[in-house]
Structures are given as structure tokens and as C-alpha cells.
Amino acid sequence: MVMTDPIADMLTRIRNANMVRHEKLEVPASKIKKEIADLLKREGFIRDVEYIGDNKQGILRIFLKYGANNERVITGLKRISKPGLRVYAKADEVPRVLNGLGIALVSTSKGVMTDKDARQLQTGGEVVAYVW
């Protein structure tokens, strides 16, 4: 079966694993998924990410992060730009998520970055998702 939106699938897997407080999850790998996972790790939303090569597509193993009393670090994930309706933002129109408490993942010509990085570099792009 062909997957029409692999990024939405990855975000949904993270959201579902987070809701039931799983320690880790696995998703089929791709370059953009790896960039998104690395960005989530850098911003402190996930604990770790590792790539497992299997002579085919590969697998990303994502380790979720929880607080001291097992509270969730990720409270929400939302896919914004979808295959049927792409959402783009100019450099001065890059959105803020919850007044800076969350991040917007923006796919630019310089790679996937947060909304803060995109504003600093004065570059726009496709608004992939919101994480808070």
C-alpha cells in the first residue's frame, strides 16, 4: 500500500506512542524524517534518535522524552502543510506557535529548521508542522 503523506504518518506515530507513554517507536526512514527527528531532539522534545540500516529504506528509532513525574514533554503535534494543500510562508510571515512556547517546523532551501531559525536567517518555506 502506498503512503500518501509519510511525514503525517511519522507525526501520528509519535503522537500515539506519546499518548500511551511508550519509551520508543520505529518509523520507516527518509532524509526529511531524519531532519525532523534531529530537530525535535535538538529542541528537547525527544530524547534520542538513531538510524538502523536494513539494506532497504532503513528505520528511524525514536526515543521519547518524559518529565520527572512521567508527564509528557510533547503536548501536541499538528501537520500543517499537507499533500492536498501546501502551506508556504514568506520570511516575514513565518508563524509563532503559542507565542514562542512551541515550534513550527519549516522546510526551506537551507533544510528543515524551526520558526526561530527561519526568522533569523530571513528565509521562508513550507510550514511542515507545529510542535508544542
Curated annotation (Swiss-Prot):
Keywords: Ribonucleoprotein, Ribosomal protein, RNA-binding, rRNA-binding
Quaternary state and interactors: Part of the 30S ribosomal subunit. Contacts proteins S5 and S12.
Parts forming coiled coils: none
Purpose: One of the primary rRNA binding proteins, it binds directly to 16S rRNA central domain where it helps coordinate assembly of the platform of the 30S subunit.
Gene that encodes it: rpsH
GO annotation, biological process: translation
Family: Belongs to the universal ribosomal protein uS8 family.
Alphabetical list of PANTHER family matching this protein: 40S RIBOSOMAL PROTEIN S15A
One CC-aspect GO term: ribosome
Alphabetized GO MF terms: rRNA binding; structural constituent of ribosome
A Pfam family recorded for this sequence: Ribosomal_S8
Cited HAMAP family: Ribosomal_uS8_B
Protein name: Small ribosomal subunit protein uS8
